[in-house]
Amino acid sequence: MPAVTTPPSNSSTSPHKEAIRKLHDELAPERNRWLRKAAFFHSEDLLYLKFLIPAGSRILELGCGTGHLLAALKPSQGVGVDISSGMIEQARQTYPDLTFLQGDIEDPTFINSLSGPFDVILIMDTLGVLSDCQQTFTNLHQLCARETRLIVVYFSHLWKPILKLAELVRLRKPQPPQNVFSPQDVHDLVALADFEAVKAELRILSPLWLLGIGRFLNRFIAPAPGIRSLCLRHYTVCRSLLNKDDGIHSATVVVPARNERGNIEQAVLRIPQFCDDIEIIFVEGHSRDGTWEEIQRVMSVYPQRNIKAMRQPGKGKADAVFAAFDVAQGDVLMILDADLTMPPEHLPKFWEAIRSGKGEYINGSRLIYQMEDEAMQFLNLIANKLFSIIFTWLLSQRFTDTLCGTKVLRRSDYEKLKAGRKYFGDFDPFGDFDIIFGASKLGLKVVEIPIRYAKRTYGETQISRFRHGILLLRMVAFAFFRIKAL
């Protein structure tokens, strides 16, 4: 990792910091009472943070207060830091299994004393009192690995008058003078500190229960385009750009094949040697045209290629792909559909995008370049473009083509995706959305690579337009209730 310059800081002795420390020491005995007063708001906050942060993660919370949030996230290793000794004392008494440290998070010497890396670094309502946000972010790189997510949570500047009124009527605990940030300000600050915002979400339209109306508003009304910009809370998920390369060297290309006999040899001949160690796994799906026999023949003709073959245990593309992923040896996992409508010659672009750290989940897109005549029917094209807009909104990450078969991610990230699959369940027979939704939930950096979609030269398509459309409608409803409307 490149060296990070950390100039000395004397912010912990500034009058501003002393005022913050004193205020929070005074508020510490009453902290739990204030939490109970705003119990609904804090439960809404926690709901989304639990979605972002899997239980069992290694979590560092900067500005932890009395530790209630850190404990609720159920970390395997939890470290909380706060400038207030009063808050830290209460946290230690209440949650003895977690680690709580009193310190100034703007002090590079203190940050240097922490032992990382962590899976998640959480900065919750702390930006507003920092003297130098950019330098604070910069100091955190040494606590990050490639997979670490920095999550920054803050109040919308649009709500400042309402929050001030809540203080005056004693619905919110007293606050020190606050910096006020727009979403663009936060994105610029993390970028200046060599972090990259990979996902941004707005939530909570009502901080009050209102006899259940608040829950309805937050779940179903707050996500709506236009309304969303009025929400109280901003959540920005970032990754370190100084730790984006973790040394990948090998790849597995998984080729699910059902009734694709005429494409098997061409797949082997056309997959370039884009890295030193390429494993090709054909997964045969109960074909009727001799595909399995052709795979065996091709393996014997090209012994110099590392080709493996397996018959899928169940049915459907998802079953085939995940069966191969479970036995794959490569650092990077790639899906190449056996119809070769995504030209295998494009695979080096996908490899370079993930090897260089430009992306962590690489998705092909058929809908940017002109495609060959008859490669996709007009109604399919219109539907795909419409659904790409919907899924971009649902996932808060840009997608132009969710059903391109070529998808690439690290094997280590697939293992995390697999471990968290119980959240979504067995819902997708094709596997496209299983991977996309899992990557989005993990906060992976998504990069799309345009490909020139070619028409099929052998066999027939495995899916009808009607089934294709029904699948997309099902996935929209599923994503809304499992990702957007929590």
Which sequence ranges carry the predicted segments?
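Conserved donor nucleotide-binding strand/loop of the catalytic core
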Residues: L101-G103, W292-V327
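A short glycine-rich, Lys/Arg-flanked "PGG" loop and its adjoining helix->strand segment in the class I
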Residues: Q134-R146
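Short aromatic/hydrophobic "clamp" motif used to bind/position activated sugar donors
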Residues: L333
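Class I SAM-dependent methyltransferase SAM/SAH-binding core
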Residues: G65-D107
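Conserved class I S-adenosyl-L-methionine
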Residues: T5-A55, L211, I221-A222
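A conserved acidic beta->alpha catalytic loop
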Residues: E284-E293
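Hydrophobic helical membrane-anchoring modules
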Residues: P2-N10, N218-A251, V255, E260-G262, ...
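Acceptor/aglycone-binding surface of glycosyltransferases and processive sugar-polymer synthases
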Residues: W159-P174, N179, M310-V327, P344-G425, ...
